[in-house]
């Protein structure tokens, strides 16, 4: 990201969104916020993203990098600056003390304790503008965090790989690999920014997955998600999911909402279980997003990506809408959200 000057507030917010994505997965339990500081001539004088827990928020990181050039400048940030004391002082204090001229943000802070920053800034004489690229931010880097704030439960993304005829394995049960290497690398990148990976005991017993996030060279990513195994069956002590490469939690239930309550301290959960677990979560309305890696192969046979979802006729079909479609190597990645 070597942009030195912007021509519009929207362009500056686009850069702030990039900074937000850059820190996603490293800021838990704080939201992954990005900030850019622009002087009156459109020159970027400071930028940054939220630091890990205990570190500074994005606005303060950007102010630190801007130094005295922040005076009279425009601060563009993906979320309303906070107005409370936590492990760090309120961001509004730093903005007022830096004598910035204007603060532009995308989405309001829904936290009743931390919110109210916009009003505080206005009262101090700063110009404040809200809602810039709000939909892009809310559906992008802050999607999972905002869901957690609204519901108190983690955001669940069901990820699966399938052939173009909807099969998750061949008739003999083999599935390595349906998706391409490029798709698998993309998945590992997503694992590295998730808080937890969720599978059932059936997947562990059948496939013995490690459920780790890895880099392109095969080494472990610096940050590993919590591995969560759901079900009442025992798994062998030598199972790879129990190795010391990451932490593992066992949740002995078949009820999706019990699982989510047990993970209520998490924000972003990847459901990678097989058709039984996926079906249970879909029936419970516990999936917020679907990521389907579709490979250009035909398998036929009985092994579908999902079991019964409680639909007996076409009228009662579970209807989703496409969020995005992109090419990942030879595969397609379909992203869908609930209507």
UniProtKB/Swiss-Prot annotation:
EC number from the UniProt entry: 3.5.4.26, 1.1.1.193
Binding site for Zn(2+): 57, 82, 91
Superkingdom as given in the UniProt entry: Bacteria
Cofactor binding comment, as recorded: Binds 1 zinc ion.
Gene3D superfamilies: Cytidine Deaminase, domain 2, Dihydrofolate Reductase, subunit A
SUPFAM superfamilies: Cytidine deaminase-like, Dihydrofolate reductase-like
Pfam families xrefs: dCMP_cyt_deam_1, RibD_C
Active site: 59 (proton donor)
Annotated region described as Deaminase, given as residue ranges: 1-152
Cofactor(s) named in the record: Zn(2+)
Region of interest (Reductase), residue spans: 153-339
InterPro entries: APOBEC/CMP_deaminase_Zn-bd (IPR016192), CMP_dCMP_dom (IPR002125), Cytidine_deaminase-like (IPR016193), DHFR-like_dom_sf (IPR024072), Eubact_RibD (IPR004794), RibDG_C (IPR002734), Riboflavin_Biosynth_HTPR (IPR050765)
Positions bound to substrate: 175, 191, 211, 214, 272
Catalytic activity: 2,5-diamino-6-hydroxy-4-(5-phosphoribosylamino)-pyrimidine + H2O + H(+) = 5-amino-6-(5-phospho-D-ribosylamino)uracil + NH4(+); 5-amino-6-(5-phospho-D-ribitylamino)uracil + NADP(+) = 5-amino-6-(5-phospho-D-ribosylamino)uracil + NADPH + H(+)
UniProt pathway: Cofactor biosynthesis; riboflavin biosynthesis; 5-amino-6-(D-ribitylamino)uracil from GTP: step 2/4; Cofactor biosynthesis; riboflavin biosynthesis; 5-amino-6-(D-ribitylamino)uracil from GTP: step 3/4
Domain CMP/dCMP-type deaminase intervals: 7-129
Role: Converts 2,5-diamino-6-(ribosylamino)-4(3h)-pyrimidinone 5'-phosphate into 5-amino-6-(ribosylamino)-2,4(1h,3h)-pyrimidinedione 5'-phosphate.
Descriptive protein name: Riboflavin biosynthesis protein RibD
């Amino acid at each position: 990201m070597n942009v030195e000057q912007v021509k519009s507030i929207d362009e500056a917010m686009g850069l702030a969104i990039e900074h937000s994505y850059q820190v996603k997965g490293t800021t838990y339990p704080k939201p992954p916020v990005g900030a850019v500081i622009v002087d009156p001539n459109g020159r970027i004088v400071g930028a940054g993203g939220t630091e890990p827990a205990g570190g500074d928020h994005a606005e303060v990181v950007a102010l630190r990098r801007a130094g005295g050039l922040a005076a009279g400048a425009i601060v563009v940030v993906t979320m309303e600056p906070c107005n409370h004391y936590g492990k760090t002082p309120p961001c509004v204090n730093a903005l007022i003390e830096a004598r910035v001229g204007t603060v532009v943000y995308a989405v309001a802070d829904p936290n009743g304790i931390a919110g109210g920053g916009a009003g505080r800034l206005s009262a101090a004489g700063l110009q404040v503008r809200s809602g810039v690229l709000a939909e892009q931010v809310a559906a992008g880097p802050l999607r999972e965090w905002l869901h957690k704030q609204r519901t108190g439960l983690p955001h669940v993304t069901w990820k699966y790989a399938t052939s173009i005829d909807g099969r998750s394995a061949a008739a003999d049960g083999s599935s390595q690999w349906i998706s391409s290497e490029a798709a698998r690398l993309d998945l590992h990148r997503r694992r590295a920014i998730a808080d937890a990976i969720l599978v059932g005991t059936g997947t562990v017993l059948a496939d013995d997955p490690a459920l780790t996030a890895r880099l392109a060279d095969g080494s472990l990513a610096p940050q590993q998600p919590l591995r969560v195994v759901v079900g009442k069956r025992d798994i062998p002590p030598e199972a790879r999911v129990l190795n010391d490469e990451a932490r593992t939690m066992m949740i002995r239930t078949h009820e999706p909402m019990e699982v989510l309550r047990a993970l209520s301290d998490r924000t972003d959960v990847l459901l990678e279980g097989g058709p039984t677990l996926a079906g249970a979560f879909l029936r419970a309305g516990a999936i917020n997003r679907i990521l389907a890696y579709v490979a250009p192969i035909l398998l036929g046979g009985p092994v579908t990506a999902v079991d019964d979802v409680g639909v007996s006729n076409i009228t009662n079909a579970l209807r989703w809408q496409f969020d995005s479609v992109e090419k990942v190597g030879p595969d397609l990645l379909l992203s869908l959200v609930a209507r």
